[in-house]
């Protein structure tokens, strides 16, 4: 039975806004029913004529009897990532908040299920060397533009236009005010919404904060350099890590010097076959691989070991991480939407001399800016409102969260934004990267967000638990890339359905063409490559393995290079089937 949700009487338009009808739906990985639908908006909001596009909307309803009128909204990063894909994880992480509040998720125009601007820039599939080529390969981008322009005006997918879409959806659902959580680029989107619709925001959380004048990718080189030095310094302060790598800074210099002389050979697991494959690794891609690792607090704990191996001539771990990062971009992001945003809001405003200065002497260098500028020369440039790059000063209670060693959005960025927000608090998570995975005590951050939204104010918010967050021990053992053969009986005993122990994930382990695959309900499918009788690599996800507990019938997924710390535990859902 469809659910009709009345439109808000406080809508900005004089005419009553359309009523958005949502229907009960199943979301993979989500326990219980959600409510789903689509909402049409004008592609050209200014002229209100021509093409209309559909936005994907998911509401995860509140579970308790005492319901608050203002939902919790998530705006994802990228730019280009889907927000609705995060429904299961958000419902699990913020279960206490969901007791009283709906979780509202809308895929921003150009992403996910909202007229996605996807570009297949690293094809053909299985071409590993192609996937390890330019970050913005120009011919595929030119072809993607030609394909998308058949039914899209690529100049109309900027942040300001998209945030007016979100407000229209809010009104159509009958919500008066929102509690917004923005992550990474989503913090820019949140600030834009706060500027354009301040009376509609009850609270805002900015996680991995992007200042309005950040000009992506201008600050990638110095940000990554700062993060790398910080992580290596923490290794030097840990007894075991320092003992294993006493000359780590010197070894790091050797790696970048060697790569600066030309590409090196490395070996990666082919995500299609699971077989080791030789590839050529450039300095740019090696730097990108290390930068990807620094994004993750857990993977950053592997950086010293990976650089040490590379200094000894083994570049396989770096190549694996560069490849998995590229595959993740293809799987989760909309390259066309990324270009439509950054080619209007960022790249045109970068001074080439400033880009050269900020990149000088960093391990990243200027390759990203040079390639992104060339890509934007091929992409239509949208317009931005006057004053778009100016700081936002909305009087909205705002909690800003940064990781100490975030390579993309360092704490300084949050301080810069908070300076103009009269009701704000900025906190820095020790040891944290762009994501806070793998840190001990990190549930403190989630609890602070929940308390803040429930109170609607920063008054009395105690942040002392932040100081108790710790990094797990650095990985000091080398990564070995090896694949073994398994018998039919060995493969068969692992088949079946699994549930995450205490979490939202659902998975199916299946056999296809004699190989095992794990299919996550919400996260996609991965080939499993056996490295031991009960131990499998998730091909294309760097540093992750599945460890089967055959006696207990459970499966544990652990990151290969963080001393076996579990990140996911699966338990059988049903009896094993052949």
Regions found by a protein language model. Give the residues of each.
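Generic recognition of flexible, low-complexity loop/linker segments
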Residues: 328-330, 385-390, 414-416, 484-486, ...
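Intrinsic disorder and flexible/low-complexity segments
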Residues: 302, 325-326, 371
């Amino acid at each position: 039975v469809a659910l009709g949700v009345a439109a808000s009487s406080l809508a900005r338009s004089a005419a009553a806004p359309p009523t958005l009808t949502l229907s009960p739906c199943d979301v993979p990985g989500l326990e219980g029913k959600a409510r789903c639908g689509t909402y049409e908006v004008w592609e050209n909001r200014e002229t209100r004529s021509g093409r209309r596009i559909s936005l994907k909307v998911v509401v995860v309803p509140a579970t308790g009897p005492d319901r608050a009128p203002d939902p919790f909204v998530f705006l994802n990063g990228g730019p280009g990532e889907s927000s609705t894909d995060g429904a299961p994880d958000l419902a699990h992480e913020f279960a206490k908040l969901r007791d009283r509040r709906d979780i509202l998720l809308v895929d921003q125009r150009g992403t996910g299920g909202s007229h996605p601007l996807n570009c297949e820039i690293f094809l053909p599939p299985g071409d590993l060397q192609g996937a390890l080529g330019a970050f913005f390969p120009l011919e595929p981008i030119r072809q993607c533009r030609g394909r998308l322009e058949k039914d899209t005006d690529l100049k109309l997918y900027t942040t300001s236009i998209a945030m007016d879409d979100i407000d229209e959806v809010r009104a159509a659902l009958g919500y008066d005010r929102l509690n917004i959580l923005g992550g990474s680029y989503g913090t820019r989107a949140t600030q834009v919404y706060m500027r354009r619709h301040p009376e509609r925001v009850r609270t805002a959380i900015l996680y991995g904060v992007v200042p309005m004048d950040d000009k992506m990718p201008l600050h990638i080189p110095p940000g990554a350099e700062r993060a790398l030095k910080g992580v290596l310094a923490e290794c030097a302060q840990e007894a075991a890590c320092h003992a294993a790598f006493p000359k780590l800074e010197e070894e790091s210099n050797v790696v970048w010097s060697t790569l600066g002389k030309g590409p090196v050979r490395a070996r990666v697991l082919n995500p299609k076959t699971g077989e080791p494959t030789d590839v050529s690794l450039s300095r740019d891609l090696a730097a990108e691989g290390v930068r990807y690792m620094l994004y993750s607090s857990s993977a950053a704990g592997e950086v010293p070991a990976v650089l040490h191996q590379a200094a000894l001539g083994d570049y396989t771990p770096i190549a694996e991480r560069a490849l998995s990062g590229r595959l993740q971009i293809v799987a989760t992001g909309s390259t066309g939407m990324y270009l439509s945003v950054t080619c209007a809001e960022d790249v045109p405003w970068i001074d080439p001399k400033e880009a050269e200065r900020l990149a000088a002497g960093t391990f990243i260098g200027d390759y990203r800016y040079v390639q992104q500028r060339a890509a934007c020369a091929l992409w239509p440039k949208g317009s931005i409102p006057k004053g778009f790059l100016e700081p936002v000063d909305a009087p909205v209670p705002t909690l800003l969260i940064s990781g100490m060693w975030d390579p993309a959005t360092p704490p300084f960025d949050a301080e810069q934004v908070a300076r103009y927000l009269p009701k704000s608090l900025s906190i820095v998570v020790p040891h944290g990267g762009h994501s806070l995975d793998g840190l001990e005590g990190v549930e403190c951050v989630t609890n602070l967000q929940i308390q803040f939204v429930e109170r609607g104010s920063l008054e009395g918010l105690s942040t002392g638990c932040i100081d108790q967050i710790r990094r797990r021990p650095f990985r000091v053992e080398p990564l070995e890339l090896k694949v073994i053969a398994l018998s039919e009986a060995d493969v068969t005993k692992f088949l079946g359905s699994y549930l995450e122990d205490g979490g939202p994930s659902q998975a199916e382990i299946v056999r296809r063409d004699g190989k095992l695959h794990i299919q996550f309900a919400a996260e996609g499918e991965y080939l499993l490559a056996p490295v031991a009788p009960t131990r499998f690599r998730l091909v294309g996800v760097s540093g992750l393995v599945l460890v089967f507990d055959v006696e207990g019938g459970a499966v544990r997924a652990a990151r290969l290079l963080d001393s076996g710390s579990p990140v996911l535990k699966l338990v059988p859902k049903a009896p094993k089937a052949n």
